Structure formats: C-alpha cells, structure tokens
C-alpha cells in the first residue's frame, strides 16, 4: 500500500494591505463594525497580480524549498473560483510558469471547500501508485469579483495563495478519515455568475454579476451543518474531538469558529485563526493557515500531529479531512 505525505508547505499574499480603516474611506463602514462582526482587521488585495501569478509563486517556493527539479512534479491541482480565464486553466498557467513539463494540471472548483476537496483527490492519486509527487494549491483573487460598493461582502474577502507538496513514501496514511458533502439546492445563497448567455438562439438571458451572499443563510449553514460533518468524520476515525491536536477551518468569521468549538466541546485555543490579517481567502484560507502554522513552529510535518481540515462555502460545499501531519 502506498501512503502519501505532505512534505512541504508555502504561502504567498500580495504586498498591498487594506485595513478596515482604509475601507471606511470608500464605503459606509468602520473598523469596529467590521471587526466585531467578523474578526477581520486587514486583508491583502492584489494591485495587478492574477490568480495564476499568486499560485505560481507558491508552486516555485514549494519546489525550491524541497530542492526538486520542476520536471519531477507529476500533477498540479489548483483549487480556485477566481481563475484567470476559463481556458487555459489556472493550473495549466502555473505548470507553464514553473516549468513542470511532465505534470498534468487542472483546476478544481469547490469555493471555500476547494483545498480540502483537492487534497483528498491528490491523496488518492498518490495512494493509487500511479503518481509519486504533486502540488495542491488554493489560490484566489477575490478582489476582482467583489462589488466594492457592497459593505456586506466587500469587507470580508482578501487575495492570496498557499499550497502543499504531496509525495509518496509515508509509513502511515495521510488522511485518517474524511467526509465531503455538497448541496446544490442551496447554491444560490452564495453566488457569482461568470458569463452572460446572449446568443441568437437563447430564449433567456442570464447576466454576469458580482459576488452575492445571503449572509444569515450562510452563517446558519456553517454553524449547523459543518459541526455535524466534523463529528461524523471524527466517528469514522474513532477519535474524540479532544484527541485532535489542532483544528484548521476555513477562515470566514471568528464567530463561526467560536460556535464550532462550543458545539464540539473543544477548547477554542485548538481552533487556529489568522483571518484578522487576511480576511476570507476562500480556497486559499486553509493552506495559508497550514503554512503559517508550520513556519511559526506551531507544529511540524513529522507525522506526529493530528489535524482537522474543514472547508465550507459556495456550492454549497463542505468537507472534513482528518490528517496526520
């Protein structure tokens, strides 16, 4: 049996930092209003870099830090809902930028659950024995799809990218247990339409739009459905909530994390948090938190730490992977 392991982490965010006070100059809001409701203080906003640019910087760092040749990468998966273009994929652009000429590459679209879905997929590619090494990256430039006049959504999101190098050769499974879910019937509660349908043959025209969100519906979904998903995954792994060392959840709202910890009966300190500096970076939020945690020495990649990764967001999608790091 081939087991996969995460052997390297990296993250990158644009240099431009936009604070709550900065936002108060362009919309009717203030620092206290934003922070008290979200836990967000700052976010990094691109001044020109696109999604593939952010992802490529992460990919290059992963390869460089591992002293690898780009030609040894077998696959690249980029989780994103803000691609540079429909074709080519963001992953294909990354493959070209880093020179991973032997890698197949594709995007995975699952919004804020994207990194967890992508990691699950990559782990199966490795454990099948067909591939030895791949990059899994979450990358978003949400600033290009936000309505900057809508304070209910514009204050929430940031831009960034992060990822992992996943390789064969572990002595234990990377994923102890997992549970991925989707409910498309609730998809309109978090929506970003991409393109018009305007042809001579169309009976109805669908116009593109900026991001729209039913905030209360999404909050209720997060605090109701997601803890059940985590608990079900813990049961599959035969673990209690307290036996997990750290919980790395999608960084959407600090109040959501407060309620998650309470529902699971876990001390809040186990729920790591960095949304105060990055905002909601969608598919990039979990890997940014993972990369920062390793870089800051909170835990290492020695296989001795049990971590819950949980994403939740548009689709609606949500999923948990309990992993050995």
UniProtKB/Swiss-Prot annotation:
Region (ACP-binding): 251-255
Family annotation (InterPro entries): ACP_syn_III_C, ACP_syn_III_N, FabH, Thiolase-like
Entry EC no(s): 2.3.1.180
Annotated active site: 112, 250, 280
Metabolic or biological pathway: Lipid metabolism; fatty acid biosynthesis
Subcellular location, record wording: Cytoplasm
Disulphide-bridged cysteine pairs: none
Keyword line: Acyltransferase, Cytoplasm, Fatty acid biosynthesis, Fatty acid metabolism, Lipid biosynthesis, Lipid metabolism, Multifunctional enzyme, Transferase
Gene Ontology molecular functions: 3-oxoacyl-[acyl-carrier-protein] synthase activity; beta-ketoacyl-acyl-carrier-protein synthase III activity
Signal peptide: none
Pfam families with a match to the protein in the record: ACP_syn_III, ACP_syn_III_C
Superkingdom, natural source: Bacteria
Reaction equations catalysed: malonyl-[ACP] + acetyl-CoA + H(+) = 3-oxobutanoyl-[ACP] + CO2 + CoA
Record comment regarding domains: The last Arg residue of the ACP-binding site is essential for the weak association between ACP/AcpP and FabH.
NCBIfam families attached to this UniProt entry: fabH (TIGR00747), PRK09352.1 (NF006829)
Record-stated family: Belongs to the thiolase-like superfamily. FabH family.
Name this polypeptide is given: Beta-ketoacyl-[acyl-carrier-protein] synthase III
Species this protein is from: Lactococcus lactis subsp. lactis (strain IL1403) (Streptococcus lactis)
UniProt lineage: Bacteria, Bacillati, Bacillota, Bacilli, Lactobacillales
Gene transcribed to yield this protein: fabH
């Amino acid at each position: 049996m081939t087991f996969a392991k995460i052997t390297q982490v990296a993250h990158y965010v644009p240099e431009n930092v936009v604070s709550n006070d900065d936002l108060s100059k362009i919309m009717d809001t203030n620092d206290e209003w934003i922070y008290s409701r979200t836990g967000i203080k700052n976010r990094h906003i691109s001044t020109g870099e696109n999604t593939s640019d952010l992802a490529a910087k992460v990919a290059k760092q992963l390869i460089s830090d591992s002293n690898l040749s780009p030609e040894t990468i077998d696959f690249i998966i980029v989780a994103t809902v803000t691609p540079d273009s429909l074709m080519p994929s963001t992953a294909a652009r990354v493959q070209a930028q880093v020179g991973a000429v032997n890698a197949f590459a594709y995007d995975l679209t699952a919004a804020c659950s994207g990194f967890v879905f992508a990691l699950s997929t990559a782990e199966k590619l490795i454990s099948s024995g067909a591939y030895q090494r791949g990059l899994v990256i979450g990358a978003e430039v949400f600033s290009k799809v936000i309505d900057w006049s809508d304070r209910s959504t514009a204050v929430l999101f940031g831009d960034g990218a992060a990822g992992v190098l996943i390789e064969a050769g572990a002595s234990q499974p990377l994923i102890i247990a997992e549970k991925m879910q989707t409910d498309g019937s609730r998809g309109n509660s978090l929506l970003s339409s991409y393109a018009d349908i305007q042809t001579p043959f169309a009976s109805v025209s669908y116009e593109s739009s900026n991001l729209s969100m039913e905030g209360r519906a999404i909050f209720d979904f997060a605090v109701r459905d997601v803890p059940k998903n985590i608990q079900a995954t813990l049961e599959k792994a035969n673990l209690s909530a307290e036996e997990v060392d750290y919980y790395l959840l999608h960084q959407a709202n600090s109040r959501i994390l407060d309620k998650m910890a309470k529902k699971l009966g876990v001390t809040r300190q186990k729920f790591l948090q960095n949304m105060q500096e990055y905002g909601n970076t969608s598919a990039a939020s979990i890997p940014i938190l993972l990369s920062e945690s390793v870089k800051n020495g909170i835990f290492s990649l020695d296989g001795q730490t049990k971590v819950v990764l949980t994403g939740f967001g548009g689709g609606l999608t949500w999923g948990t992977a309990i992993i050995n790091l």
